[in-house]
A protein has these predicted regions:
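Short, solvent-exposed polar/charged micro-motifs at secondary-structure junctions
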Residues: 37-41, 114, 143-146, 248
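Active-site-proximal helix-loop-helix substrate-binding element of RNase H-like nuclease domains
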Residues: 6, 49, 54-69, 79-162, ...
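Short active-site-proximal "capping" loops at secondary-structure junctions
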Residues: 33-38, 64
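Accessory DNA-binding and partner-docking regions appended to nucleic-acid-acting proteins
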Residues: 148, 164, 168-291
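Catalytic-core regions built around general acid/base machinery
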Residues: 16-19, 68-78
């Protein structure tokens, strides 16, 4: 395991960025631990892991006074940001912080062009049990302090990206795919990533087969769930799962009080406050476009 510095203040971040710049670093491996409606509402950048080829850095964005201080590190940076599968991380930066990292090198784009369909650990040969990886990935990365095993896991994903980049770029050149990679990689970097949680109401099971009236009720229910989740900083799935929403629709339950009673019937945790849910339904009915 490579040594790493834990960056927890704006001053430490500025010092690290200046040190990397002064050292003439040209490539910086990067990965992000994020949260998307798992333990709290919405999209969050919880941790940023970096490796310059010799030393690792873990930046805690939750401890920064101003996340704009990340921009000299990530936006129009003087180094390539080496990622493996950057899409979700770029979405998180864009919507949680208003940051659009560049220039990036997304190694998953290179791997797919070469017909390599494995994940990062498959391509680097770095093993580990699937159960352990799943446990770490589902950990609450927003909780502080983070344990040493979590920090060690986090930094491990960036330690082999330089070597993987060298290998994949050489193979792209050999097979005449370097220009195709350049184009696709730039598309990945510059894509405008839209996150609109209100637009996903069609994910309710069997939505398209519902009657027009039930589709309208389902949409209001989805909006109200999102509003309640925002108000209580609660993942929408903990307010009402898609299965529960379909049951509410099928049972013809329409009033907020009845819906709250249905959701709370067998719950000891994540109980819904009827009055708050009622306010969310009132607001949802105003927001849902009329058919």
């Amino acid at each position: 395991m490579a040594a790493y510095d834990l960056i927890q203040t704006d001053a430490e971040l500025a010092h690290m960025t200046a040190r990397l710049r002064d050292a003439g670093v040209k490539r910086l491996a990067i990965d992000v631990e994020g949260e998307n409606n798992l333990h709290r509402y919405g999209i969050h950048v919880a941790l940023i892991q970096l490796f310059d080829g010799a030393r690792g850095y873990i930046v805690d964005p939750l401890s920064l006074r101003d996340t704009n201080s990340l921009k000299p590190l990530l936006e129009n940076a003087p180094w390539e940001l080496i990622w493996f599968d950057a899409g979700n991380d770029l979405l998180s930066f864009q919507h949680a912080m208003g940051i659009k990292p560049s220039p990036i090198v997304d190694l998953v784009v290179a791997a797919r062009l070469l017909g390599k369909n494995g994940g990062l650990h498959d391509l680097t040969g770095e093993g580990g049990s699937a159960r352990a990886k799943d446990r770490f990935q589902r950990a609450n990365w927003l909780r502080r302090p983070l344990t040493a095993p979590l920090l060690d896991y986090a930094i491990s994903d960036v330690l082999h990206l330089h070597e993987l980049q060298d290998s994949l770029m050489a193979e792209l050149e050999q097979k005449g795919l370097a220009e195709a990679f350049r184009v696709k990689n730039l598309q990945t970097q510059n894509a405008e990533r839209v996150w609109d949680p209100y637009a996903n109401y069609t994910r309710i099971s069997g939505f398209k087969g519902l009657s027009r009236e039930d589709r309208e009720s389902a949409r209001v229910l989805w909006y109200a769930r999102e509003l309640y989740g925002q108000a209580h900083d609660m993942p929408p799935g903990n307010v009402a799962s898609k299965q529960e929403m379909r049951m509410i629709i099928d049972k013809g339950i329409r009033s907020a009080d009845q819906i709250a009673a249905f959701l709370n019937e067998n719950r000891s945790r994540n109980r819904v406050v009827p009055a708050d849910l009622s306010r969310c339904f009132t607001e949802a009915e105003k927001q849902v476009p009329q058919a």
